[in-house]
Amino acid sequence: DFPAAPDGTPASQDFFTGMPSKCAVGNILYSWNYAYNTENVKGTPKTIKDFFNTKKFPGKRAIYKSALTNLEIALAADGVKMGKGGALIYKRLEEEGGVDRAMNKIKELCTDPNGGCVFWSAGAQPPELLVAGEVVMATGWNGRFFNAEVGENAPIAQVWDGQGLDYEYFALVKGGPDEANAKKALAMMT
């Protein structure tokens, strides 16, 4: 049980959909989106399709070194509508050929002579790769791009089309040490 927000909003109505669950509560909400180097890209990419369009926007892309989010953005770029919470994308991924369709889109990008892929595994890498000019576009986390763009005055701009929302959780082990105080701390942090 969480206390009401300062404005009186009940905790059950004060969290993003799905963040409080029976076992955990979300502590940060962020977006998987992409950004581009404004000095190295001619024109203004606006859609997730633009991320995959190496004819209009030539140059290497940086993508996460996992299927996580790559499959979703590949299908969105291939014309699959997102649906609420990405429901239509996930429905397509569950269907026969859905994963293959997404993987083929990624393979096309990574083997395209006008493009190619650099794979990243740490959140700081996408803005670093963009600023260094190693890639012209990169997928990543909106907060990392924001910090580089605003905090470091990096020449990058974010594109929100096709973004995926994600969150991290706090969880407590039932019957764990000092459970009562752990619950109080969790309530204060959220």
State where each predicted segment sits.
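Alpha-helix initiation and capping sites
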Residues: Y64, E96-D100, W120-A124, A132, ...
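Extracytoplasmic/periplasmic substrate-recognition and gating elements
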Residues: M137-R144, E149-T190
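Extracytoplasmic ligand-binding site segments that recognize negatively charged/polar headgroups
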Residues: D1-L129
